Design a protein with these regions (language model features):
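Alpha/beta enzyme core
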Residues: 2-7, 14-42, 55-64, 78-208
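A glycine-rich helix N-cap at a beta->alpha junction
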Residues: 66-74
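Divalent metal-dependent hydrolysis catalytic cores, especially in the metallo-beta-lactamase
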Residues: 40-48, 71
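Short active-site-proximal "capping" loops at secondary-structure junctions
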Residues: 48-53, 75-78
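Histidine-centered divalent-metal-coordination microenvironment in nucleic-acid enzymes
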Residues: 211
């Protein structure tokens, strides 16, 4: 990938999680139009499966706002990905952004059921398969697929590199490396990004994003 910097704006999705923040669909459309005027590269418009209002907002922005790529969030679940596609399909350009928790804390909390594995290592392998399957499924709808290893800041670096390499091989074109809980110091997070770039063999086949 080239060294061009791409501006990814998530005001309408992650920004709305701020305490007291709640936007009507019409307000989201207006913000998206203003972001388009600013020439941002990607607008993450929402999480379509989470509510009817979220779906409507993403669908309306996809239909009405031209210029930027319109992105929608989806868990590593086929129904989420299908909903994202249905909301996005009217867009000039669109991206499906899928994610899975990868830190030990997230894995043992969100994937505690034995169906995901009897121990941490088995659960880690299950999550890699889920992520690969999700990226492959999303690729059937669009060539532009982003993957986020949620809570990357607290994720074991070797496991982080393993799952990133696997999803890039499956077709992910953007890898977001989020410090979801604000756990790491800036220097520490920078070292984590350096390690990913050094250890992931196919990292040059994807854009790295850090949110």
């Amino acid at each position: 990938m080239s060294e061009k910097i791409h501006i990814f704006d998530t005001t309408l999705r992650d920004g709305e999680q701020a305490p007291g923040s709640s936007l009507e669909v019409e307000e989201k459309i207006e913000i998206a139009k203003q972001l388009s005027k600013l020439n941002v590269d990607v607008i993450e418009a929402g999480f379509p499966v989470s509510s009817k209002a979220q779906y409507q907002a993403v669908e309306s922005i996809a239909d009405m706002v031209n210029g930027p790529t319109i992105a929608a969030l989806a868990r590593c679940i086929e129904n989420d990905i299908e909903k994202a596609y249905q909301a996005l399909k009217g867009a000039e350009k669109y991206r499906i952004h899928t994610f899975a928790g990868t830190s030990d804390i997230h894995i043992m909390g969100k994937f505690s059921d034995h169906k995901y594995g009897k121990d941490l290592n088995e659960k880690r392998n299950t999550i890699i398969k889920m992520a690969v399957d999700a990226v492959s499924f999303a690729k059937s709808f669009t060539g532009d697929v982003e993957f986020s290893p949620e809570d990357a800041g607290r994720t074991d670096i070797n496991y982080l590199c393993e799952i990133i390499e696997a999803v890039i091989s499956a077709g992910a074109t953007v890898i977001n490396i989020p410090d979801t809980t604000g756990y790491t110091m800036p220097e520490e997070f920078g070292e984590k990004i350096k390690s990913v770039k050094k250890k992931v063999k196919n990292i040059n086949n994807a854009i790295i994003s850090c949110l």
